[in-house]
Amino acid sequence: KNVITTAKMAAEKSKKTVVVLDTKTMLDGYYFLKNKDTDIDELKEAASRNYSVEITKAVRDTKIEDLSIEKDDFIGLVNGKIKYAKKSLKEVADAILDDLVTKNTITAVVVSGNEKDEASQKSIEEKLAGLKTANINGNQENYYYYLYIENKDPNMPEIAILTDSVSDLTDEDIEGLPIKVVPLRIDINGELYKDGVEISKSEFWHQMLDNNARIKTSQPSPQDFLNAYNKLFEKGYKKIISIHPSSKLSGTIQAAKVGRSLTNRENDIELIDSLGASLLQGFLVLGAAGKSVRGESFTEIINWVNNFRTKGKLLMIIPDLKYLEKGGRIGKASSTIAGALNMKPILTVNQGEVTVEKKVLGERNAQKYIEKYIERESKKQSIVLMSGWGGTPTELENVVRIYSEVENNPKINSLILNREIGAVIGAHAGPVYGVFIFPRLS
């Protein structure tokens, strides 16, 4: 306790953000260190479901609540409190594991002391059979065993959804949902950052537009995906649906495929090419996660994603083509001619490939084209609209303007508005804005 109090005092004096975790046992600390990359609040909540057990011997007769303890009894402490007392080491270990290991238990850690006996050791092995168990020969004195029993959330769904930062999902989007986001890497003037983790969207745009930084992107490594898949299985998920940007736009899904092949559970991981990116990809992920929470099956969710990914229409305006030219997406001549004529291409995604929907003169005419397209589609059926932007306040103002022209249409329902588009799209396209629409019935 004195150590924790001192640590908290030191944390208050630090200029950096420091979180002091009030652990009760050694294996509490082990659990937090093992999961050090997990969100702190999420980790604290998960730890509250776990049991840290210490088995030792009583040094005197005593009584704790309704538990009578005699000297030399074997006692079991659970999360720092004495809960069990038996005459043999095997008996106390059996009683503890019979009570604490349930259908929600996913992993266990067993640290054996130098006075363990064969009977208790064999019994512990039998009772933990079928669980992922880490056995450590600690050779500690006085404590026969340290046990750590990790449990999943009893209300968690069986299916997790994994994606990457191209989805442009926020922490608020995924809160409470079975979603894991693997960040791509952003190279800014030779310095690598994890997208959305070590660099925010606003900082990326500042570096690109204000500092004229040299920016490149790279997909996660197969090891990144292997680690993410294993983490989800360790949490207790039985299946994973992994949704990523179009293979014609990024090599991310190929890295995920290699990562999947390195697991021993390939049949439990379904890889899906979203045939798009950003707004479309993010919506597929949110939709799939919602279906998982509602208890829909692995096959049902996969079929929905595969069917829906071709239902929508993405329309994006790129005000300045120089970024596409710098990235080699278009030639310098095309960029120069388009600039001289004030030509504004409206881009879409068709079967996973970026194509030109329409070329118009002037940015306002490009906006009007999108507005008319939305109105035309709404006459056929009710539609849902999402909008996004990236770059400067001008792009935000323009996408707000597009929506303001159609928002009073009773057949148009908004879902996500003014979503900021991040580094992966922005690094190649520069400032950008537009909409994604799809039939409401889908």
What is the predicted role of each segment?
Residues 107, 160, 239-241:
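Structural motif
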Residues 1, 8-20:
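Conserved GHKL (Bergerat-fold) ATPase module
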Residues 6, 10, 23-123, 136-139, ...:
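Mixed-charge interfacial surface used for oligomerization/domain docking
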Residues 161-162, 216, 242, 271, ...:
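Short catalytic-loop micro-motif centered on adjacent basic/acidic residues
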